Design a protein with these regions (language model features):
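Calycin-type beta-barrel ligand-binding domains and close structural analogs
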Residues: 7, 15-17, 21, 48-172
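Short N-terminal edge-element motif at the start of the domain
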Residues: 1-52
Length: 172
């Protein structure tokens, strides 16, 4: 468990990818901070708006055999925690479990973990359209790769997500 947590905690950015393909990838920073033994606060922000993350969350990491289950929580009124501030003030009553949004990871090499969403029931409304999230995650000691897409609830066609492959975030 400690290796997985060590790989996941930190600050990551896709600056190289965004500079190489500026019309395909925005420059994004992902921060993961340990706030409990196996609990992580996370945020994602455009590099030019680091003080206004577009996504803030808490993850509980639970090991089940060879798998690491990332239990995803929405933070109610998360603004006070932007830029990873006041994290000691996060309490359980501020968190809402996101049913169907767990990510399951497995160790696939000595320094590699791979996984993704475990169901088709992680619901997100995107521009008024009900979608479910599908993602794949690859994690190493130096890189965090994520492919996210939202699929239409009825037609199962892609509504949002990268057309160009994974976001490749390098450890900072």
């Amino acid at each position: 468990m400690s290796q997985f947590i060590d790989f996941l905690v930190g600050t990551f950015a896709n600056k190289v990818q965004a500079q190489s393909h500026p019309t395909r990838y925005a420059h994004i920073r992902v921060s993961h901070r340990l706030i409990g033994e196996n609990r992580i606060y996370g945020e994602q922000a455009y590099n030019y708006l680091k003080n206004r993350p577009y996504r803030q969350f808490v993850i509980d990491v639970v090991q089940q055999g060879e798998e690491y289950h990332l239990k995803n929580y929405e933070i109610i009124n998360p603004q006070q925690f932007a830029e990873c501030k006041n994290l000691d003030k996060i309490t359980d009553d501020m968190l809402k479990y996101r049913e169907g949004c767990d990510v399951i990871m497995r160790k696939t090499g000595t320094k590699t973990f791979f996984g993704g969403t475990s169901t088709c029931e992680c619901w997100v409304t995107w521009n008024g359209t009900k979608t479910y999230v599908q993602n794949e995650v690859k994690l190493t000691d130096s890189e965090y790769q994520v492919t996210d897409k939202g699929l239409h609830a009825e037609s199962h066609t892609k509504v949002w997500g990268s057309d160009y492959g994974a976001f490749r975030f390098l450890r900072q």
